[in-house]
Amino acid sequence: MRYPREALATLARYGVRYHGWAANAAAPAIFARHLATVHVPRRYYTQLLPGIPTIRVFEALACGIPLVSAPWEDSEHLFRPGQDFLFARDGAEMTRHLRAISADPALRASLVQSGLETVRARHSCAHRAQELMRIVETLNPAAQPHLARIVA
């Protein structure tokens, strides 16, 4: 994410080291260097698009890194909070979760295993392609040739 100067100054005041924007393709290498990652969804996603997780949740779990997230509504029950990742309702709980992950290799392994299991079972690219094709099949048959050109 790209932040305005004012936001970067606020982060610095709180001791947060911002290393700059990274392309999605770089996420696996970045995640591989750390014990856990934190997800704080933007207000846009939590208020205007409630129930829809950001791509970060999928990326982190697919990359096999323990995830601690600020709250967001999982209205479709895509993931298993407390098993695939941990929710933190406030800064103190975030700190507790991160300390627990840091100190407990079994907790880290369990979160990684569960997160990967959920992604592999329900959220792979193949799953999304199959889902898209099911949607296309339900559309007006007259529209299917046009859609076939778009999908191809």
Q: Model-predicted segments: where are they?
A:
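Generic anion/oxyanion-binding catalytic loop in active/binding sites
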Residues: 16-19, 49, 83, 104, ...
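Nucleotide-sugar donor-binding catalytic core of glycosyltransferases
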Residues: 1-62, 66, 72-78
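Hydrophobic, well-ordered secondary-structure elements that form the walls
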Residues: 60, 85, 124
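Short, contiguous hydrophobic alpha-helices characteristic of membrane insertion segments
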Residues: 67-70, 83-89, 135-148
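C-terminal amphipathic helix plus adjacent low-complexity
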Residues: 95-152
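Residue-level signal for the nucleotide or nucleotide-sugar donor/cofactor binding architecture
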Residues: 55, 89, 123
